[in-house]
Regions:
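Positively charged n-region of N-terminal signal peptides that target proteins for export
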Residues: 18-24
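Acidic, Ala/Val/Gly-enriched low-complexity intrinsically disordered segments
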Residues: 5, 9, 13-18
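Intrinsic disorder/low-complexity segments in short proteins, especially the signal peptide
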Residues: 6-7, 35-39
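Short, flexible active-site-adjacent loop segments at beta-strand->alpha-helix junctions, enriched
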Residues: 21, 30, 196
Length: 378
């Protein structure tokens, strides 16, 4: 007879016997995935450093913004000049167009996508780059600038938790409209690693699927992603499906090991509607019983016994590093920095309290019946 440990179902009252062998097997699978990822390849040069790049974008920016309401938007040709670590300027051709969904239509300064020429960027800081998403302030003003910093810190938090995350790089970007229809301005923005590049770096493949079935998800990776979403109080995501008519999944890129499409790994992105960022336009989904976006509400799936506990232990193991990220950043104004630090601290206080974990995390998991069916087939 195999030795066993006792854990509990979501109500905390029914004992569930879980073999240690199963937990060891799950941990071994996760270790293999992480080892494969770490051995896959290095990050491209742009994402090997955390220093802020200084750059100037000269392009018909006003024309690009004028297309924001169009489904088909043309790339506008321009120039990208950046300074390297030695202060030497480098000029690259670039094309731009607006991107995104909500922010593209709502924001005065719609997000841009950069399109570089692969041959031209060879042997530069942008070597290997083709298309890059830019996350920038929604509107002019210091308050909107702080929102960009907070979203950048959300990405950095996920990078601390797992390599299975999008790389980012800050840019002090000056915008110059080549038609002189807009006055020049400068903002702190960040660029995000291309999804195909991320998959290649991790030695995984990107899946273009309509939806994920409950039993197709990599449980440890999914549980970790869902705890991260709780940490930043983000409910604007799904690991099961995308918006109607779109590929899976909403604000989650789906990756899988080569040859194993039934071990799907969700990679979160797009955090402007999170409580951490707390943008003026953010509001909780009407489907969950909270009024304020800053209120944390767990929307994760139910997982086999031990999976969520292991994910919480992994998050706790990164606690000091995460808190140091928010304590040491020079990019936040003092009041915002203090309130943000406290907000992150409150998440770890939740994890420290077993009764709250049972009530606010385990007790709110979704798909209990689907989990029972999945376990009955194993």
């Amino acid at each position: 007879m195999l030795p066993s440990v006792i854990s509990y179902d979501k109500r905390g009252v029914i004992p569930v016997i879980v073999s240690r062998m199963m937990r060891i097997l799950l941990a071994t699978i996760l270790l293999v995935l992480l080892t494969t990822a770490s051995a896959a390849s290095e990050r491209l040069p742009l994402f090997q450093d955390e220093s802020i790049i200084k750059a100037v974008l000269t392009a018909p920016i006003a024309q690009a913004y004028a297309q924001r309401d169009q489904d088909v938007r043309l790339y506008m040709p321009g120039q990208w000049v950046y300074a390297d670590a030695d202060g030497e300027n480098h000029r690259l051709d670039v094309s731009i167009r607006t991107r995104g969904l909500f922010r593209r239509e709502y924001c005065d300064l719609s997000p841009l996508q950069l399109n570089f020429k692969k041959k031209q960027v060879k042997d530069t800081l942008f070597d290997g780059q083709n298309k890059l998403k830019v996350v920038a302030p929604c509107k002019h003003g210091a308050q909107w600038q702080q929102k960009v910093v907070l979203e950048y810190l959300a990405y950095r938090t996920l990078q601390i938790l797992t390599d299975t995350s999008f790389s980012t790089r800050l840019v002090r970007l000056s915008y110059v409209d080549s038609d002189e229809s807009m006055e020049p301005w400068t903002d702190l923005v960040f660029v995000i690693e291309d999804d195909d590049d991320m998959a290649d770096r991790l030695g995984l493949v990107k899946l273009g699927v309509v939806a994920n079935q409950f039993n197709q998800l990599d449980r440890p990776a999914t549980a970790l992603a869902e705890l991260f979403q709780l940490l930043i109080a983000n409910n604007d995501y799904s690991v099961l499906q995308g918006p109607e008519g779109d590929e899976c999944c909403h604000n989650s890129e789906i990756l899988a090991p080569k040859g194993n499409a039934d071990s799907r790994i969700p990679v979160p992105f797009d955090f402007d509607l999170s409580g951490l960022v707390n943008a003026k336009y953010a509001a909780p989904p009407s489907s969950i019983p909270i009024r304020f976006v800053r209120t944390r509400y767990y929307r994760g799936l139910c997982h086999p016994p031990g999976v969520l506990e292991d994910a919480m232990a992994q998050v706790q193991s990164k606690r000091a590093e995460i808190m140091a990220l928010y304590a040491s950043t020079p990019l936040l104004e003092p009041r915002t920095k203090a309130s943000t630090y406290r907000y992150i601290e409150e998440f770890f206080e939740l994890l420290d309290d077993p009764k709250r974990v049972q009530k606010e995390i385990v007790g709110r998991c979704r798909g209990e019946d689907e989990l029972a069916e999945m376990l009955s087939r194993d």
